[in-house]
Amino acid sequence: MYQVDSEDANFLFMEKAESPTHISLVYLYDQSDLGDDPVRFTHIREHIGNRLNSAPVFYQKVQRTPADIDYPYWVDDKKFDLDFHVRHLALPKPGDWRQFCIQVSRLHSRPLDMSRPLWELYVIEGLDKVEGFPRDSFALYFKVHHCAMDEFTAQELLQSLHSQLANTRQHESSSQHIAHLPSNAPAPLEMVLRGVLNNSVRTLRLMLQSASNMRTLSKIVTRLSIRMAQDAVEGEQSGDSSNRFSQPLSAARVFEGTFYPRQLIDDYAQLVPGATTTHAMLAICGEAMRLYLEKHGELGEVPLRALLEVNVRNAGAHALVGNRIAINQV
């Protein structure tokens, strides 16, 4: 049986109406070199339809257990409808960057349908006045639930869909994995019995681990308590640190972006020995955030912190399902 593991299931159980846990990727395409034979929506739909076996996420949905007694199962969607998942829309005139960002914001604000495979792909046409792109450019907006994959896997999957080859490395690895996936979930009674057994095993394993690591756990709890007390005191001394990013969440999301030459990012990274392009992008985003808060008079004295997902897969590893990430605070 292929069951959602604990790390992936967390993204399901944490989801709320105001904080959905899906992720998305945006790709922009310049098709001016194609002349009188541009890419059409029907071509993209057919191309994706022929590659649904590249990963189980495309045709499997999540089946939750009664009362969430256990982690959910991945099961085949017997009513799979490609037209529900691959959609087509166009920007209103004049089709500029602002309208594109508004459209992406609306799409990302909508939760995924949990009764279907947890992904959607939008072909967005009408990008006629986006600086740096010619008329008739288009974009792909790909949205997938975080319980199915992280952004690194999503990027690899979407890139594999661009291949004209039927047997890429990604296709080969995923086809081997698909052979072991169930087509149906267990019956409700069986799911309950499995849940009781699995929870008993997990509890026993946790007790054994806790017994062998009690001294280490005690030290961790002590240090954590001290740190929390220090943070509380520092927070009181520093005064009100609230800004527009520390307010209660709503379901609405805002997307914005800009373009930088890759060489500029590489040159920026070389200014600090050992720095990578990721470090350079973090520095750019951090400075942009500082300037934004400063403009609105909300910079404050308390540093703004964010969480950064880091890919922890081994080099060369391919996994078109699940999450293999660590969370760093920056």
Language-model segment annotations:
Residues 1-7, 26-36, 46-53, 60-330:
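Soluble acyl-CoA-dependent acyltransferase catalytic core bearing the H(X)4D motif
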Residues 1-23:
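Generic start-of-chain signal for non-secretory N-termini
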